[in-house]
Amino acid sequence: MSRFAHFLAVDWSGAKGPRQKGIALALAKAAGGPPVLLAPPDPKGWARAEVLALLAGLEVPTLVGLDLGIGLPFADAGAFFPGWDASPADARGLWALIDALCAGDPHLEAGGFVSHPEGSRYFRHGKGLEGDRFLLPGASTREGRFRVAEAAQRTAGVRPVSNFNLVGAAQVGKSSLTGMRMLHRLGGAVPVWPVDPLPEQGSVVTEIYTSVAARLGGVTGTATKVRTYAALNDALDTLGSPPVKGTGAIDDHSSDALLTAAWLRRVHTERDLWHPPALTPMVARTEGWTFGAF
């Protein structure tokens, strides 16, 4: 029997603005049944602060999956920001630094960090606009720096993008930075694995990558987005979940959240996923990990 009663998947967005159509929350119950979307308080979409309040107020043991990076690369250079004396020593220090430098940004946005005279040097901002520290000296690829977990993600058949990359439809840098602001403000109200040890009871927040869930749900090919109810229900069936109601098209934010909530329910008892070989104490403390990467 699961120690979690609920499985909550959050498809996140780092876009500007008070409310985001790109944020979707879905809940699967340990007792069974199809995953369900949680309606935002406003038809215009979720505010990031509302998601923060929901997480801080969880009343039943919930395994939360956030589709964002909870850390930045550290192991490859022994620092998040090599050459910058303000570079923090661990993930919680990173979250605090980002939140402090973005204090003037509304809606948990992160413009203040990526435009900071030092911080901006580590990011790719646009075509032909790349910070002088985006790449490490002697880098073998132009893709940017990656965390240890992202190397593990590739073994699942997906292609992660560097969290230092702010360009393109697949970039996750902005969403990760806004998510780190939220995690800082969560302030330990809910443990964040593996930055914090996995608690024996209560709720816990993890990082997820919805493409990994899609792969394990049987979605194949170069694209891992599910855009029809029929395809979503096929994937849910593979994960042992009852289907959701609906026909025709579904937006990929909603399908990502629904599929991943069911996936969390299906795989959370697999001990190996909580103990991947490359997850050392240093990696846990600094970069964090993607639940499901092995």
Show the residue positions of the predicted features.
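RNase H-like (RuvC/DEDD) metal-dependent nuclease/polynucleotide-processing core
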Residues: 2-8, 12-294
